[in-house]
Curated annotation (Swiss-Prot):
It is an enzyme of class 2 (transferase). The modification N6-(pyridoxal phosphate)lysine is found at residue 42. The keyword Transport does not apply. SUPFAM superfamilies: Tryptophan synthase beta subunit-like PLP-dependent enzymes (SSF53686). Its cofactor is pyridoxal 5'-phosphate. PROSITE patterns: CYS_SYNTHASE (PS00901). Pfam families: PALP (PF00291). This is Cysteine synthase. One of its GO terms (molecular function) is cysteine synthase activity. Pathway: Amino-acid biosynthesis; L-cysteine biosynthesis; L-cysteine from L-serine: step 2/2. The lineage of its organism: Bacteria, Pseudomonadati, Bacteroidota, Flavobacteriia, Flavobacteriales.
Length: 307
């Protein structure tokens, strides 16, 4: 299969059946967003936001893109900026992994670190400061950009509809910017009226559950606030996940299924176990889909804890 550039390989990710990980009566499927060229689902929104800005005349060949990011969006933006020739400055909390920073540097991006205790709010504030100081700059504002939601309505959800024409009962997915869960929930619920969409967030920062924001180790999951593009009316439930159980299922999935995915993946798998396995409230014929937005390579920083 031939493509004219790396950007054409974004999307159309595979869906794989889980066979050995759970003792379950459900037919469980996982959508592998790690198959995107930058290694995560964030490649989709990076391309969408930049092309939306181009169409609106907000970017030109001399523009600088500045974005606060927890990691994967930064990698996606770095990949797209490299192909399109834009200068990119990424702002992130210092708690984000060294692996992600090195990948961004490999694509040619510059980055600025902010205090970990300020979380993503601190990164957003710093990005806004840099934008004011930098002529001809543009901030994608992934937490507020409608293009983030739109790309998931138009691509991710359509791929799911094509793969599951018979329908789905549950979708379990995490919340970072809120674009993915909002986009697929909006599109899928139009076709699957009985679909239940379950959001996953860190137990140490359970903002959607009514708790307080706090630092946590599940990178990319839980921004510490409710993003403006997140439509909480589309959610049928919110569940939390802890670090230890998440790591446990990351390595079990690798050993039993040959699927080595990242923090989103491990959190969803552990939540599936607690939510579905042995729960008589769920029908034995239920069909759940779990999304896995990143590669397991991003876990290697903590490999001593999971291997």
């Amino acid at each position: 299969m031939k493509f004219q550039n790396a950007l054409e390989t974004i999307g159309n990710t595979p869906v794989v059946k889980i066979n050995n990980l759970f003792n379950s009566d459900h037919e469980i499927w996982i959508k592998l967003e790690k198959s995107n060229p930058g290694g995560s689902i964030k490649d989709r929104i990076a391309l969408a936001m930049i092309e939306d800005a181009e169409a609106k005349g907000l970017l030109n060949k001399d523009s600088t893109i500045i974005e606060p990011t927890s990691g994967n969006t930064g990698i996606g933006l770095a990949l797209v900026a490299a192909v399109k020739g834009y200068k990119l400055i990424l702002v992130m909390p210092e708690s984000m992994s060294i692996e992600r920073r090195k990948i961004m540097e490999a694509y040619g991006a510059e980055f600025v670190l902010t205090p970990r205790e300020k979380g993503m709010k601190g990164a957003i504030e710093k990005a806004n400061e840099l934008a004011e100081e930098t002529p001809n700059s543009w901030i994608p504002r992934q937490f507020d950009n409608p293009a983030n939601v739109k790309i998931h309505v138009e691509t991710t959800a359509q791929e799911i509809l094509q793969d599951f024409p018979e329908g789905l009962d549950y979708v379990i997915t995490g919340v970072g910017t809120g674009g993915h869960i909002t986009g697929i929930a909006k599109a899928l619920k139009e076709k699957y009226p009985n679909l239940k969409v379950i959001a996953v967030e860190p137990e140490l920062s359970p903002v959607l559950s009514g708790g307080s924001p706090a630092p946590h180790p599940l990178q990319g999951l839980g921004a510490g606030f409710v993003p403006s593009i997140l439509d909480i009316t589309l959610l049928d439930g919110v569940i939390t996940v802890g670090k230890d159980e998440a790591y446990e299922y990351a390595i079990n999935a690798a050993k039993k299924e040959g699927l080595f995915c990242g923090s989103f993946h491990r959190s969803r798998l552990s939540r599936y176990r607690k939510t579905f396995t042995g729960n008589t409230a769920w029908s034995k014929n239920s069909l759940p889909l779990i999304t896995t937005p990143e590669k397991g390579i991003f876990l290697l920083r903590d490999s001593s804890k999971i291997l």
